[in-house]
Amino acid sequence: GWQIQPNANSVQQELQKALSTLLRRDMEVVGAGRTDTGVHARKMAAHFDWEGEELDAPQLTYRLNRILPRDIAVKDIKRVADDMHARFSASSRTYHYYIHTCKDPFERHYSLQMNFPLDFDRMNQAARHFLHHKDYAAFCKAGGDNKTTLCEVTQAKWVQTSPSTWYFEITANRFLRNMVRAVVGTLIDVGRGKISESQFLDILHNGTRSDAGESMPGHALFLEEVRYDL
């Protein structure tokens, strides 16, 4: 996961430790989101404040990648405006959730194997309702720091990449704690025929977290992109 936590490694902790070592002062790194343990990120954005001589960004990128663990890579470092904030300045975020329907040992750490048939047409039909809905209280895990459960979803669809592999793509201005994994679990219930589209709509508009589907495992979830209006 991203966020520093006791008795566990995190991306934030490793980045702060590496930056502090190279810049020879205590550094704080702020990420665009708080991915849970086991969730991956292809394009996480983060910022740190710096007062001092101009940094050589390419050289700092190179040196960071030399000392960071093998499962963390810095792609680029850019100077931005002083009021830029990795989390609060983001205009949208995109997540993918990967599933496969045939056993594949090479996919098992990054995709969830489905051992039952799914109706992806029904799942996509249900997913389209997210584009016209704002309140996602039914898909929010208790205990988060969200002051509101309102989100603006602009993309929600299942995409097939091979006869046996799919991913769910969802883009929104913000996401609630555990929201994507709960959304995927509920859509899978639709695809299995466990709930009808009308039942799905009732959960969407009137439901609580206990009415929605189970939270799917984190290892198949990827933060794919964070966008900013610069």
Spans of model-derived segments:
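Structured-RNA-binding interfaces characteristic of tRNA pseudouridine synthases
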Residues: 1-230
